[in-house]
Amino acid sequence: MKLQHVVYLVAIFFVVAIFVIACIEENKYLVWIMIILANTTNILSLVRSISYIKNIRKHQKDTKIQRQLFFEKNGGGMLIERLSGAGSSNIDFKIFTEEDMKEATNGYDVSRILGQGGQWTVYKGILPDNSIVAIKKTRLGDNNQVEQFINEVLVLSQINHRNVVKLLGCCLETEVPLLVYEFITGGSLFDHLHGSMFVSSLTWEHRLEIAIEVAGAIAYLHSGASIPIIHRDIKTENILLDENLTAKVADFGASKLKPMDKEQLTTMVQGTLGYLDPEYYTTWLLNEKSDVYSFGVVLMELISGQKALCFERPETSKHLVSYFVLATKENRLHEIIDDQVLNEENQREIHEAARVAVECTRLKGEERPRMIEVAAELETLRAKTTKHNWLDQYPEENVHLLGSNIVSAQGHTSSRGYDNNKNVARFDIEAGR
Protein backbone atom coordinates (compact mmCIF):
# COMPACT_ATOMS: atom_id res chain seq x y z
CA MET A 1 0.00 0.00 0.00
CA LYS A 2 1.32 3.44 -0.92
CA LEU A 3 2.29 5.93 1.83
CA GLN A 4 -0.39 8.44 0.82
CA HIS A 5 -3.06 5.76 1.24
CA VAL A 6 -1.78 4.97 4.75
CA VAL A 7 -1.79 8.65 5.75
CA TYR A 8 -5.29 9.02 4.38
CA LEU A 9 -6.63 6.07 6.41
CA VAL A 10 -4.87 7.23 9.60
CA ALA A 11 -6.35 10.72 9.19
CA ILE A 12 -9.85 9.30 8.82
CA PHE A 13 -9.32 7.18 11.94
CA PHE A 14 -8.26 10.19 14.03
CA VAL A 15 -11.17 12.31 12.79
CA VAL A 16 -13.66 9.63 13.78
CA ALA A 17 -11.95 9.05 17.14
CA ILE A 18 -11.81 12.75 18.04
CA PHE A 19 -15.44 13.19 16.97
CA VAL A 20 -16.51 10.41 19.34
CA ILE A 21 -14.45 11.86 22.23
CA ALA A 22 -15.77 15.36 21.55
CA CYS A 23 -19.33 14.10 21.72
CA ILE A 24 -18.66 12.36 25.02
CA GLU A 25 -16.64 15.13 26.70
CA GLU A 26 -18.42 18.08 25.04
CA ASN A 27 -14.97 19.60 24.56
CA LYS A 28 -14.96 22.50 22.10
CA TYR A 29 -11.19 22.24 21.62
CA LEU A 30 -11.57 18.70 20.45
CA VAL A 31 -14.28 19.85 18.07
CA TRP A 32 -11.88 22.40 16.55
CA ILE A 33 -9.17 19.76 16.26
CA MET A 34 -11.68 17.52 14.52
CA ILE A 35 -12.56 20.29 12.06
CA ILE A 36 -8.88 20.90 11.30
CA LEU A 37 -8.22 17.21 10.77
CA ALA A 38 -11.30 16.92 8.59
CA ASN A 39 -10.03 19.73 6.40
CA THR A 40 -6.63 18.06 6.34
CA THR A 41 -8.33 14.88 5.17
CA ASN A 42 -10.09 16.80 2.42
CA ILE A 43 -6.79 18.33 1.37
CA LEU A 44 -5.21 14.87 1.27
CA SER A 45 -8.12 13.64 -0.86
CA LEU A 46 -7.62 16.56 -3.20
CA VAL A 47 -3.88 15.88 -3.41
CA ARG A 48 -4.61 12.24 -4.06
CA SER A 49 -7.07 13.10 -6.87
CA ILE A 50 -4.63 15.54 -8.45
CA SER A 51 -1.86 12.92 -8.27
CA TYR A 52 -4.15 10.32 -9.86
CA ILE A 53 -5.11 12.64 -12.73
CA LYS A 54 -1.47 13.59 -13.19
CA ASN A 55 -0.46 9.92 -13.44
CA ILE A 56 -3.21 9.24 -16.00
CA ARG A 57 -2.10 12.17 -18.13
CA LYS A 58 1.53 11.10 -17.84
CA HIS A 59 0.60 7.57 -18.91
CA GLN A 60 -1.43 8.91 -21.82
CA LYS A 61 1.45 11.16 -22.84
CA ASP A 62 3.95 8.30 -22.57
CA THR A 63 1.61 6.03 -24.55
CA LYS A 64 1.17 8.69 -27.23
CA ILE A 65 4.93 9.18 -27.46
CA GLN A 66 5.47 5.41 -27.61
CA ARG A 67 2.89 5.03 -30.38
CA GLN A 68 4.52 7.83 -32.33
CA LEU A 69 7.93 6.19 -31.93
CA PHE A 70 6.56 2.86 -33.17
CA PHE A 71 4.81 4.64 -36.05
CA GLU A 72 8.07 6.22 -37.20
CA LYS A 73 10.12 3.05 -36.59
CA ASN A 74 7.71 1.02 -38.71
CA GLY A 75 7.89 3.49 -41.58
CA GLY A 76 4.69 5.48 -40.95
CA GLY A 77 6.12 8.78 -42.15
CA MET A 78 7.46 7.12 -45.29
CA LEU A 79 4.10 5.46 -45.95
CA ILE A 80 2.16 8.73 -45.68
CA GLU A 81 4.66 10.43 -47.97
CA ARG A 82 4.44 7.64 -50.55
CA LEU A 83 0.64 7.55 -50.38
CA SER A 84 0.51 11.28 -51.02
CA GLY A 85 2.92 10.92 -53.93
CA ALA A 86 0.93 8.01 -55.38
CA GLY A 87 -2.31 9.96 -55.21
CA SER A 88 -3.98 8.46 -52.15
CA SER A 89 -7.43 9.42 -53.45
CA ASN A 90 -7.09 6.56 -55.94
CA ILE A 91 -6.03 4.03 -53.28
CA ASP A 92 -8.63 2.52 -50.95
CA PHE A 93 -6.25 2.06 -48.04
CA LYS A 94 -6.59 3.06 -44.38
CA ILE A 95 -4.01 3.62 -41.65
CA PHE A 96 -5.58 2.34 -38.42
CA THR A 97 -4.70 3.42 -34.87
CA GLU A 98 -3.65 1.04 -32.11
CA GLU A 99 -6.96 1.75 -30.36
CA ASP A 100 -8.83 0.70 -33.52
CA MET A 101 -7.02 -2.64 -33.49
CA LYS A 102 -7.57 -3.26 -29.76
CA GLU A 103 -11.29 -2.63 -30.08
CA ALA A 104 -11.54 -4.73 -33.24
CA THR A 105 -9.87 -7.76 -31.61
CA ASN A 106 -11.40 -7.29 -28.15
CA GLY A 107 -7.95 -6.61 -26.73
CA TYR A 108 -6.30 -9.34 -28.83
CA ASP A 109 -8.43 -11.96 -27.11
CA VAL A 110 -7.23 -15.51 -27.72
CA SER A 111 -10.72 -16.49 -28.84
CA ARG A 112 -10.23 -14.19 -31.84
CA ILE A 113 -7.13 -16.01 -33.12
CA LEU A 114 -7.77 -17.49 -36.58
CA GLY A 115 -4.31 -18.96 -37.13
CA GLN A 116 -0.67 -18.81 -36.07
CA GLY A 117 2.73 -19.37 -37.63
CA GLY A 118 6.35 -18.93 -36.66
CA GLN A 119 6.36 -15.27 -37.71
CA TRP A 120 2.71 -14.25 -37.44
CA THR A 121 -0.67 -14.45 -35.73
CA VAL A 122 -3.98 -13.71 -37.45
CA TYR A 123 -6.95 -12.35 -35.49
CA LYS A 124 -10.57 -11.96 -36.44
CA GLY A 125 -11.44 -8.27 -36.14
CA ILE A 126 -14.76 -6.43 -36.11
CA LEU A 127 -14.59 -2.77 -37.18
CA PRO A 128 -17.01 -0.05 -35.95
CA ASP A 129 -19.15 -0.47 -39.09
CA ASN A 130 -19.51 -4.19 -38.15
CA SER A 131 -17.44 -5.33 -41.13
CA ILE A 132 -15.30 -8.38 -40.37
CA VAL A 133 -11.59 -8.31 -41.21
CA ALA A 134 -8.51 -10.47 -40.70
CA ILE A 135 -5.76 -8.71 -38.73
CA LYS A 136 -2.29 -10.14 -39.22
CA LYS A 137 0.34 -9.45 -36.59
CA THR A 138 3.77 -9.91 -38.13
CA ARG A 139 7.29 -8.68 -37.42
CA LEU A 140 10.09 -6.98 -39.27
CA GLY A 141 13.47 -8.66 -39.29
CA ASP A 142 15.34 -5.37 -38.78
CA ASN A 143 15.04 -1.66 -39.43
CA ASN A 144 16.84 -2.02 -42.77
CA GLN A 145 13.76 -3.82 -44.12
CA VAL A 146 11.37 -0.94 -43.35
CA GLU A 147 11.58 0.64 -46.80
CA GLN A 148 11.05 -2.72 -48.49
CA PHE A 149 8.08 -3.40 -46.20
CA ILE A 150 6.48 -0.04 -47.03
CA ASN A 151 7.07 -0.60 -50.76
CA GLU A 152 5.34 -3.97 -50.58
CA VAL A 153 2.42 -2.55 -48.58
CA LEU A 154 1.97 0.17 -51.20
CA VAL A 155 2.05 -2.28 -54.10
CA LEU A 156 -0.29 -4.77 -52.41
CA SER A 157 -2.72 -2.00 -51.47
CA GLN A 158 -3.14 -1.22 -55.16
CA ILE A 159 -3.94 -4.81 -56.15
CA ASN A 160 -7.62 -5.16 -56.88
CA HIS A 161 -7.99 -8.64 -58.32
CA ARG A 162 -11.02 -10.77 -57.49
CA ASN A 163 -8.80 -13.78 -56.71
CA VAL A 164 -6.29 -12.00 -54.45
CA VAL A 165 -7.12 -11.26 -50.81
CA LYS A 166 -7.51 -7.48 -50.54
CA LEU A 167 -5.18 -5.54 -48.24
CA LEU A 168 -7.45 -2.93 -46.60
CA GLY A 169 -4.96 -1.11 -44.41
CA CYS A 170 -2.36 -1.34 -41.67
CA CYS A 171 -1.51 -0.17 -38.16
CA LEU A 172 2.04 1.01 -37.44
CA GLU A 173 1.51 2.33 -33.89
CA THR A 174 2.32 -1.05 -32.34
CA GLU A 175 5.70 -2.65 -31.70
CA VAL A 176 5.17 -4.87 -34.72
CA PRO A 177 3.13 -3.79 -37.77
CA LEU A 178 -0.43 -5.04 -38.15
CA LEU A 179 -1.90 -5.69 -41.60
CA VAL A 180 -5.67 -5.61 -42.14
CA TYR A 181 -7.10 -7.88 -44.87
CA GLU A 182 -10.56 -8.73 -46.10
CA PHE A 183 -12.01 -11.68 -44.18
CA ILE A 184 -12.55 -14.91 -46.13
CA THR A 185 -15.05 -17.26 -44.51
CA GLY A 186 -14.57 -20.67 -46.10
CA GLY A 187 -11.17 -21.78 -44.81
CA SER A 188 -8.16 -22.73 -46.90
CA LEU A 189 -7.87 -25.09 -49.85
CA PHE A 190 -5.66 -27.25 -47.61
CA ASP A 191 -8.54 -27.53 -45.12
CA HIS A 192 -10.94 -28.62 -47.85
CA LEU A 193 -8.55 -31.21 -49.29
CA HIS A 194 -6.89 -32.55 -46.15
CA GLY A 195 -8.43 -31.02 -43.02
CA SER A 196 -10.39 -33.05 -40.50
CA MET A 197 -13.03 -30.29 -40.17
CA PHE A 198 -14.09 -30.66 -43.79
CA VAL A 199 -15.45 -33.65 -45.65
CA SER A 200 -14.16 -32.74 -49.09
CA SER A 201 -16.99 -32.26 -51.54
CA LEU A 202 -14.89 -30.56 -54.20
CA THR A 203 -15.88 -31.98 -57.56
CA TRP A 204 -13.50 -31.96 -60.53
CA GLU A 205 -15.33 -28.90 -61.86
CA HIS A 206 -14.72 -27.11 -58.55
CA ARG A 207 -11.05 -28.08 -58.52
CA LEU A 208 -10.47 -27.02 -62.11
CA GLU A 209 -12.18 -23.69 -61.45
CA ILE A 210 -10.00 -23.13 -58.36
CA ALA A 211 -6.87 -23.95 -60.39
CA ILE A 212 -7.92 -21.49 -63.11
CA GLU A 213 -8.61 -18.72 -60.58
CA VAL A 214 -5.31 -19.22 -58.76
CA ALA A 215 -3.35 -19.40 -62.03
CA GLY A 216 -5.00 -16.18 -63.20
CA ALA A 217 -4.20 -14.43 -59.92
CA ILE A 218 -0.52 -15.45 -60.04
CA ALA A 219 -0.30 -14.46 -63.70
CA TYR A 220 -1.69 -11.06 -62.74
CA LEU A 221 0.93 -10.67 -59.99
CA HIS A 222 3.68 -11.52 -62.48
CA SER A 223 2.43 -9.60 -65.50
CA GLY A 224 -0.39 -7.26 -64.54
CA ALA A 225 0.70 -5.50 -61.34
CA SER A 226 2.48 -2.13 -61.48
CA ILE A 227 5.65 -3.91 -60.29
CA PRO A 228 5.99 -7.68 -60.85
CA ILE A 229 5.36 -9.56 -57.61
CA ILE A 230 6.79 -13.00 -56.86
CA HIS A 231 4.63 -14.57 -54.16
CA ARG A 232 7.30 -17.10 -53.10
CA ASP A 233 4.99 -19.21 -50.93
CA ILE A 234 2.18 -20.52 -53.12
CA LYS A 235 0.61 -23.51 -51.36
CA THR A 236 -2.84 -24.84 -50.53
CA GLU A 237 -2.71 -23.26 -47.05
CA ASN A 238 -2.30 -19.83 -48.66
CA ILE A 239 -5.28 -20.25 -50.99
CA LEU A 240 -8.50 -19.28 -49.23
CA LEU A 241 -12.01 -20.15 -50.35
CA ASP A 242 -15.09 -18.05 -49.73
CA GLU A 243 -18.63 -19.35 -49.25
CA ASN A 244 -18.98 -19.77 -53.03
CA LEU A 245 -15.65 -21.66 -53.29
CA THR A 246 -14.07 -18.70 -55.07
CA ALA A 247 -10.29 -18.91 -54.61
CA LYS A 248 -8.28 -16.05 -53.07
CA VAL A 249 -4.47 -16.05 -53.00
CA ALA A 250 -3.33 -14.89 -49.55
CA ASP A 251 -0.28 -14.33 -47.31
CA PHE A 252 2.24 -12.11 -49.04
CA GLY A 253 4.65 -12.19 -46.09
CA ALA A 254 7.37 -13.81 -48.19
CA SER A 255 6.64 -11.97 -51.44
CA LYS A 256 9.28 -10.04 -53.39
CA LEU A 257 8.97 -7.14 -55.79
CA LYS A 258 10.98 -7.72 -58.96
CA PRO A 259 12.31 -4.59 -60.68
CA MET A 260 11.43 -4.41 -64.36
CA ASP A 261 15.09 -4.34 -65.38
CA LYS A 262 16.03 -7.58 -63.58
CA GLU A 263 15.47 -11.13 -64.76
CA GLN A 264 15.95 -12.63 -61.31
CA LEU A 265 16.80 -11.76 -57.71
CA THR A 266 19.49 -13.14 -55.44
CA THR A 267 17.85 -13.72 -52.07
CA MET A 268 17.80 -15.97 -49.04
CA VAL A 269 15.72 -19.06 -49.72
CA GLN A 270 12.22 -18.87 -48.29
CA GLY A 271 9.21 -21.06 -48.90
CA THR A 272 7.58 -24.29 -47.78
CA LEU A 273 9.05 -27.76 -48.20
CA GLY A 274 7.13 -29.74 -50.76
CA TYR A 275 6.34 -26.59 -52.75
CA LEU A 276 9.83 -25.08 -52.88
CA ASP A 277 11.40 -24.72 -56.32
CA PRO A 278 14.55 -26.95 -56.27
CA GLU A 279 16.39 -24.63 -58.67
CA TYR A 280 15.77 -21.64 -56.40
CA TYR A 281 16.77 -23.76 -53.41
CA THR A 282 20.17 -24.64 -54.89
CA THR A 283 21.04 -21.34 -56.63
CA TRP A 284 19.33 -18.72 -54.42
CA LEU A 285 18.19 -17.12 -57.68
CA LEU A 286 14.52 -16.18 -57.59
CA ASN A 287 12.22 -15.42 -60.51
CA GLU A 288 8.59 -15.95 -61.53
CA LYS A 289 9.24 -19.58 -62.48
CA SER A 290 9.53 -20.42 -58.77
CA ASP A 291 5.85 -19.56 -58.35
CA VAL A 292 5.11 -21.68 -61.44
CA TYR A 293 6.73 -24.69 -59.74
CA SER A 294 4.73 -24.15 -56.54
CA PHE A 295 1.51 -23.82 -58.51
CA GLY A 296 2.29 -27.10 -60.26
CA VAL A 297 2.43 -28.79 -56.85
CA VAL A 298 -0.93 -27.25 -55.91
CA LEU A 299 -2.41 -28.57 -59.17
CA MET A 300 -1.07 -32.04 -58.33
CA GLU A 301 -2.78 -31.82 -54.94
CA LEU A 302 -6.06 -30.87 -56.58
CA ILE A 303 -5.81 -33.86 -58.92
CA SER A 304 -4.62 -36.44 -56.38
CA GLY A 305 -6.13 -35.19 -53.12
CA GLN A 306 -2.77 -35.96 -51.49
CA LYS A 307 -0.49 -33.66 -49.49
CA ALA A 308 2.60 -32.14 -51.11
CA LEU A 309 4.84 -33.76 -48.53
CA CYS A 310 3.85 -36.59 -46.23
CA PHE A 311 6.33 -38.66 -44.24
CA GLU A 312 3.63 -41.17 -43.38
CA ARG A 313 3.58 -42.36 -47.00
CA PRO A 314 6.05 -44.96 -48.34
CA GLU A 315 9.54 -43.72 -49.20
CA THR A 316 8.82 -43.62 -52.94
CA SER A 317 5.75 -41.41 -52.49
CA LYS A 318 6.69 -39.04 -49.66
CA HIS A 319 7.25 -36.19 -52.11
CA LEU A 320 4.14 -35.75 -54.24
CA VAL A 321 6.01 -34.22 -57.20
CA SER A 322 8.38 -37.15 -57.74
CA TYR A 323 5.57 -39.65 -57.13
CA PHE A 324 3.22 -37.85 -59.52
CA VAL A 325 5.81 -37.40 -62.29
CA LEU A 326 6.86 -41.06 -62.10
CA ALA A 327 3.24 -42.26 -62.23
CA THR A 328 2.68 -40.09 -65.30
CA LYS A 329 5.77 -41.45 -67.07
CA GLU A 330 4.78 -45.03 -66.31
CA ASN A 331 1.21 -44.46 -67.52
CA ARG A 332 -0.34 -45.25 -64.13
CA LEU A 333 -1.64 -41.83 -63.20
CA HIS A 334 -5.00 -43.43 -62.42
CA GLU A 335 -3.42 -44.87 -59.27
CA ILE A 336 -3.06 -41.47 -57.63
CA ILE A 337 -6.03 -39.54 -59.02
CA ASP A 338 -8.49 -38.76 -56.22
CA ASP A 339 -11.32 -41.32 -56.35
CA GLN A 340 -13.81 -38.58 -55.47
CA VAL A 341 -13.32 -36.81 -58.80
CA LEU A 342 -12.41 -39.46 -61.37
CA ASN A 343 -15.10 -40.76 -63.72
CA GLU A 344 -15.39 -41.79 -67.36
CA GLU A 345 -16.46 -38.34 -68.52
CA ASN A 346 -13.55 -36.35 -67.07
CA GLN A 347 -10.57 -38.70 -67.54
CA ARG A 348 -9.25 -36.79 -70.56
CA GLU A 349 -9.52 -33.42 -68.80
CA ILE A 350 -7.79 -34.68 -65.66
CA HIS A 351 -4.94 -36.17 -67.69
CA GLU A 352 -4.55 -32.87 -69.55
CA ALA A 353 -4.40 -31.01 -66.23
CA ALA A 354 -1.83 -33.54 -65.00
CA ARG A 355 0.32 -32.79 -68.05
CA VAL A 356 0.21 -29.07 -67.20
CA ALA A 357 1.19 -29.85 -63.59
CA VAL A 358 4.19 -31.89 -64.74
CA GLU A 359 5.32 -29.11 -67.08
CA CYS A 360 5.12 -26.60 -64.23
CA THR A 361 7.36 -28.73 -62.01
CA ARG A 362 10.24 -29.34 -64.42
CA LEU A 363 13.60 -29.10 -62.65
CA LYS A 364 14.89 -26.31 -64.88
CA GLY A 365 12.97 -23.09 -64.60
CA GLU A 366 13.56 -22.19 -68.24
CA GLU A 367 11.65 -25.33 -69.28
CA ARG A 368 8.56 -24.35 -67.29
CA PRO A 369 5.77 -22.33 -68.91
CA ARG A 370 4.95 -18.79 -67.77
CA MET A 371 1.93 -18.40 -65.53
CA ILE A 372 0.02 -16.53 -68.22
CA GLU A 373 0.49 -19.58 -70.48
CA VAL A 374 -0.60 -21.94 -67.70
CA ALA A 375 -3.73 -19.86 -67.11
CA ALA A 376 -4.51 -19.94 -70.84
CA GLU A 377 -4.10 -23.74 -71.03
CA LEU A 378 -6.39 -24.31 -68.07
CA GLU A 379 -8.95 -21.90 -69.52
CA THR A 380 -8.83 -23.89 -72.75
CA LEU A 381 -9.33 -27.11 -70.79
CA ARG A 382 -12.41 -25.65 -69.10
CA ALA A 383 -13.78 -24.53 -72.47
CA LYS A 384 -13.33 -28.06 -73.83
CA THR A 385 -15.06 -29.51 -70.77
CA THR A 386 -17.97 -27.11 -71.09
CA LYS A 387 -18.27 -27.82 -74.81
CA HIS A 388 -18.19 -31.59 -74.26
CA ASN A 389 -20.94 -31.33 -71.65
CA TRP A 390 -23.05 -29.18 -73.96
CA LEU A 391 -22.59 -31.56 -76.90
CA ASP A 392 -23.52 -34.53 -74.75
CA GLN A 393 -26.68 -32.76 -73.64
CA TYR A 394 -27.67 -31.38 -77.08
CA PRO A 395 -26.04 -33.63 -79.73
CA GLU A 396 -28.61 -32.69 -82.39
CA GLU A 397 -27.48 -29.04 -82.24
CA ASN A 398 -23.84 -29.86 -83.02
CA VAL A 399 -23.92 -29.38 -86.79
CA HIS A 400 -26.35 -26.46 -86.77
CA LEU A 401 -24.65 -24.27 -84.16
CA LEU A 402 -21.00 -25.29 -84.02
CA GLY A 403 -20.22 -26.49 -87.50
CA SER A 404 -18.37 -29.70 -88.22
CA ASN A 405 -15.11 -27.85 -88.91
CA ILE A 406 -14.88 -26.54 -85.33
CA VAL A 407 -14.84 -29.84 -83.44
CA SER A 408 -12.65 -32.73 -84.45
CA ALA A 409 -13.67 -36.37 -84.34
CA GLN A 410 -12.00 -36.70 -80.96
CA GLY A 411 -13.88 -33.73 -79.55
CA HIS A 412 -10.86 -31.39 -79.46
CA THR A 413 -11.27 -27.77 -80.41
CA SER A 414 -9.31 -26.35 -83.32
CA SER A 415 -6.18 -24.23 -82.90
CA ARG A 416 -8.35 -21.20 -83.51
CA GLY A 417 -10.41 -22.08 -80.46
CA TYR A 418 -7.24 -22.37 -78.38
CA ASP A 419 -6.09 -18.90 -79.39
CA ASN A 420 -9.49 -17.50 -78.51
CA ASN A 421 -9.25 -19.00 -75.06
CA LYS A 422 -5.81 -17.54 -74.61
CA ASN A 423 -7.38 -14.20 -75.27
CA VAL A 424 -10.02 -14.97 -72.65
CA ALA A 425 -7.29 -15.71 -70.12
CA ARG A 426 -5.48 -12.49 -70.98
CA PHE A 427 -8.73 -10.57 -70.64
CA ASP A 428 -9.29 -12.07 -67.18
CA ILE A 429 -5.84 -10.95 -66.09
CA GLU A 430 -6.37 -7.45 -67.43
CA ALA A 431 -9.80 -7.28 -65.80
CA GLY A 432 -8.22 -7.91 -62.43
CA ARG A 433 -6.42 -4.58 -62.49
Swiss-Prot record:
It comes from Arabidopsis thaliana (Mouse-ear cress). It is an enzyme of class 2 (transferase). The keyword Phosphoprotein applies. The chain crosses the membrane at residues 30-50. It comes from the Eukaryota. This is Putative wall-associated receptor kinase-like 16. Residues 108-391 form the Protein kinase domain. The modification Phosphothreonine is found at T97, T267, T272. SUPFAM superfamilies: Protein kinase-like (PK-like). The lineage of its organism: Eukaryota, Viridiplantae, Streptophyta, Embryophyta, Tracheophyta. It is found in: Membrane. Putative serine/threonine-protein kinase that may function as a signaling receptor of extracellular matrix component. Keywords: ATP-binding, Kinase, Membrane, Nucleotide-binding, Phosphoprotein, Serine/threonine-protein kinase, Signal, Transferase, Transmembrane, Transmembrane helix. The active site is at D233. Residues 1-22 form the signal peptide. One of its GO terms (biological process) is cell surface receptor signaling pathway. Its EC number is 2.7.11.-. It catalyses: L-seryl-[protein] + ATP = O-phospho-L-seryl-[protein] + ADP + H(+); L-threonyl-[protein] + ATP = O-phospho-L-threonyl-[protein] + ADP + H(+). Residues 51-433 are cytoplasmic. One of its GO terms (molecular function) is ATP binding. Its main location: membrane. ATP binds at L114, G115, Q116, G117, G118, Q119, W120, T121, V122, K136. The modification Phosphotyrosine is found at Y181, Y280. Residues 23-29 are extracellular. GO terms for cellular component: membrane. Belongs to the protein kinase superfamily. Ser/Thr protein kinase family. Coiled coil: none annotated.
